[in-house]
Amino acid sequence: MDVEVKKENQNTQLKDHEVKELIKNSQNGDQKARDLLIEKNMRLVWSVVQRFLNRGYEPDDLFQIGCIGLLKSVDKFDLSYDVRFSTYAVPMIIGEIQRFIRDDGTVKVSRSLKELGNKIRRAKEELSKSNGRIPTVQEIADYLEISSEEVVMAQEAVRSPSSIHETVYENDGDPITLLDQIADQSEEKWFDKIALKEAIKDLDEREKLIVYLRYYKDKTQSEVADRLGISQVQVSRLEKKILKQIKNQMDHFES
């Protein structure tokens, strides 16, 4: 059964108390409860998987790894936690996929993306020399006759993700990586981003790009404006419109 089928295999969402009852039964050895938890959380796993696409891995492989993280979160979830299971599970799923990519030892980027990334780098250098400043994303896109979205996505795809595994603090030989810090921060923040991912499907390409840069790359409005070649005021107005548009979808996702 492929990922697309898995995505559609969740017709109804369980209430929080139903999820916790299933977790309790699963931890007591109930295989049916365990299977139902997996089935009802497939969309959540797929939402996390989408963060790691365009790295050369098969979506279905990443989905299977994500399900391992989901199962671990079922086994380790403390029922005394005053938190939704999905909020607890997201960092576990992310961590499992990150470990898979790290242990694989390679970052697989398609040849076409690598070539486009090199073209963008050369264009950026040439435009910087001719203009006396760093070019905007739109200027690079116009120069290469491609869309601004293609510029941003290619740059992100070829950028090394190794920084997330860099040691940011070490105490008595026990290193703490950036990934550890991310997982230890507010789990609600991660779940908010996953909910947002589900809610932006109906946005146009520029709106999606603004959401991607602001909420997934934590760029400021000024940075987004520079990359898109528009003013900060325009970004602010567009963002307000976008947030208003997706509010109902996010409320539905989290209900």
Curated annotation (Swiss-Prot):
A motif (Polymerase core binding) lies at residues 61-74. CDD domains: Sigma70_r4 (cd06171). This is RNA polymerase sigma-F factor. Signal peptide: none annotated. Keywords: DNA-binding, Sigma factor, Sporulation, Transcription, Transcription regulation. InterPro entries: Cro/C1-type_HTH (IPR001387), RNA_pol_sigma-70_dom (IPR014284), RNA_pol_sigma-B/F/G (IPR014322), RNA_pol_sigma-F (IPR014236), RNA_pol_sigma70 (IPR000943), RNA_pol_sigma70_r2 (IPR007627), RNA_pol_sigma70_r3 (IPR007624), RNA_pol_sigma70_r4 (IPR007630). It comes from Bacillus licheniformis. It comes from the Bacteria. One of its GO terms (biological process) is DNA-templated transcription initiation. Sigma factors are initiation factors that promote the attachment of RNA polymerase to specific initiation sites and are then released. This sigma factor is responsible for the expression of sporulation specific genes. The keyword Hydrolase does not apply.
